[in-house]
Amino acid sequence: MKEFQTLKGDITKTRIFEGEIDLDVIDDDEIIVRVETFSFTANNISYGVAGDTLGYWQFFPAKENIDDQWGCIPMWGFAKVISSRHKEIQENERLFGYFPPSDYLKLKPTKITEQNFLDAVSHRKDLPIISNKYLRLDGAVSYTHLRAHET
């Protein structure tokens, strides 16, 4: 697994964390997604600059970060569920939402509808709901309609 990390005090300094992830280590009611694509824009740079002030570093704590010097700048993107222990979320579902610049992310879906769910992982509970909501693209009418017109 690879994860792009930024030095919180100087976002021009970066590193790639490489480690193993055991896709079978997953609790009941959790899912693991593989991040497929994301966008990195000027807006994301502002997330890094305001990371501590606005709480952006709390969304996805950096791995192997004992001294809390490194962070993961959040990005909007697409992912696919590759492992699920949640009875309402199926493997191979596609999602749109807030992701770290990483290969994988573990989520704990709650308040599930056909169109979306919230992530209930404890370190994100006090963060803005809009950034904790994941669209379930297979159930999103507008997305399905757009995909039907692809050639």
Question: Residues of each region from the PLM?
Answer:
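Long, glycine/tryptophan/cysteine-rich extracytoplasmic
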Residues: 138-141
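A short N-terminal beta-strand-loop micro-motif at the entrance of redox/enzyme domains
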Residues: 9-44
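Conserved small/polar residues in nucleotide/adenosyl-binding loops
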Residues: 144-151
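Short, compositionally biased
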Residues: 105-131, 135
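Glycine-rich beta-strand-centered segment in the early N-terminal region that forms part
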Residues: 24-38, 52-106
